[in-house]
């Protein structure tokens, strides 16, 4: 890799560190190619990406960035998992770490905040953006359905009273 390619890679990594909602750093030593492809596929499904880069170049890309502290995690065979959604990459990485003992989460960053292993697990346990939107929508919709039920209730009560009166009149 010549100098121009390295500079381009540093710029790309810098963009990743700046624009991602979450970045997870993990060791992947011992993973087979098939296992790594499976991890990449899972990450793509969730809207995230996976990048293996030279640690030295990643550390250069982190210089001056708010999440520069994750450079301390970049030792050995590391992989970067990232996504714009602040939860997606952490969820996939945590689930994959549970399925495969060779994949070990070291930590990461969420925006400007440094995350240790426990922090990544905590982020992974949070609901995703879509789940939060669904929860908010159901909370907003519940009062409206209650009001509609309350408005419709007197009409159904009147109808049942009228049918009862009609039945009594027919019986008499």
Swiss-Prot record:
InterPro entries: Ribosomal_uL10, Ribosomal_uL10-like_sf, Ribosomal_uL10_bac, Ribosomal_uL10_bac_type, Ribosomal_uL10_CS_bac
UniProt-listed SUPFAM superfamilies: Ribosomal protein L10-like
Keyword Flavoprotein part of the UniProt annotation: no
Keywords, comma-separated and alphabetical: Ribonucleoprotein, Ribosomal protein, RNA-binding, rRNA-binding
GO molecular function, one term: structural constituent of ribosome
GO biological process, one term: translation
Keyword Repressor in record: no
Entry superkingdom: Bacteria
A single GO cellular-component term on record: large ribosomal subunit
PROSITE patterns reported in the protein's UniProt record: RIBOSOMAL_L10
Role of this protein: Forms part of the ribosomal stalk, playing a central role in the interaction of the ribosome with GTP-bound translation factors.
Family the entry assigns: Belongs to the universal ribosomal protein uL10 family.
Assembly information from the UniProt record: Part of the ribosomal stalk of the 50S ribosomal subunit. The N-terminus interacts with L11 and the large rRNA to form the base of the stalk. The C-terminus forms an elongated spine to which L12 dimers bind in a sequential fashion forming a multimeric L10(L12)X complex.
Protein's recorded name: Large ribosomal subunit protein uL10
Gene (name only): rplJ
């Amino acid at each position: 890799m010549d100098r121009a390619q390295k500079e381009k890679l540093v710029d790309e990594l810098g963009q990743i560190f700046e624009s991602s909602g979450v970045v997870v750093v993990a060791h992947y030593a011992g993973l087979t190619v098939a296992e790594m492809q499976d991890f990449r596929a899972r990450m793509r499904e969730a809207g995230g990406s996976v990048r293996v880069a030279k640690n030295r170049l990643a550390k250069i890309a982190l210089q001056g960035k708010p999440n520069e502290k994750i450079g301390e995690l970049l030792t050995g065979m590391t992989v970067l998992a990232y996504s714009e959604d602040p939860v997606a990459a952490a969820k996939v990485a945590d689930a994959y770490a549970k399925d495969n003992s060779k994949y070990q989460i070291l930590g990461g960053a969420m925006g400007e905040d440094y995350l240790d292993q426990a922090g990544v697990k905590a982020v992974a346990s949070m609901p995703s953006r879509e789940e939060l939107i669904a929860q908010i929508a159901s909370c907003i919709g519940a009062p409206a359905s209650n009001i509609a039920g309350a408005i419709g209730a007197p009409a159904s009560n009147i109808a049942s009273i009228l049918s009862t009166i009609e039945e009594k009149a027919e019986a008499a």
